[in-house]
Amino acid sequence: MSITAKSVYRDTGNFFRNQFITFLLIALLCALITVVLGHAFSPSDEQIASLSQGDNLAGSVGLFDLVQNMTPEQQQILLRASAASTFSGLIGNAIMAGGVLLMVQLVSAGQRVSALRAIGASAPVLPKLFILIFLTTLLVQMGIMLVVVPGVLLAIILSFAPVMLVQDKMGIFTAMRSSIKLAWSNMRLVAPAVIGWLLAKTLLLLFAPNFAVLTPNIGAVVANTISNLISAVLLVYLFRLYTLIRQ
């Protein structure tokens, strides 16, 4: 039986709609974790404010020039802020991916699952998911920085890796290699969904500053929750598609 993207989209939409409250709670919990961790590890407001102070920054052209003209103390503050944002984002994404994939797995097996149970059930795979998401994010970002297209291609061919790691309990690099082979042979079914996910994430980044009117922390939680829901839709699609391909 041939698999069509339309049938998988419809299946994904029905599943997401039926389990929307659980998805929303997982997305919200992970957004809160991301924001709280980011706030806990970030420099203080006074230190952040100091990044824009000093005559040494006047006349800087571009981000690279700006960083070069910073004092060592300012560079340390910027590095700490970047590390806090990256680390908290990776933790939140790993928990969200694990929770969503375990929820889909359990619901597909006929079990009733709450958001907390799904996240709790994902605990054993979270360390591997964290490393996997770190590696794939690094590769995709490097590809996008080069010419954009390599980054998009990497995002497509590595998209099955989290599903394989959770569903088949593969190792990190085995999941990445298997994902490349499977996604490449099913490019017409995978590429549109991943490209749509990337476009949705990009649009959210463009509108994210508007959420700051709700206060920075609340705005960050709202933006992260929406971002998590977008990722949840893609994960459900990839899980359902992977299940159909294996049949």
From Swiss-Prot:
It is a multi-pass membrane protein. GO terms for cellular component: plasma membrane. The chain crosses the membrane at residues 20-40, 87-107, 125-145, 146-166, 189-209, 218-238. InterPro entries: UPF0259. Keywords: Cell inner membrane, Cell membrane, Membrane, Transmembrane, Transmembrane helix. It comes from the Bacteria. Pfam families: UPF0259 (PF06790). NCBIfam families: PRK02868.1. Belongs to the UPF0259 family. This is UPF0259 membrane protein Ent638_2284. It comes from Enterobacter sp. (strain 638).
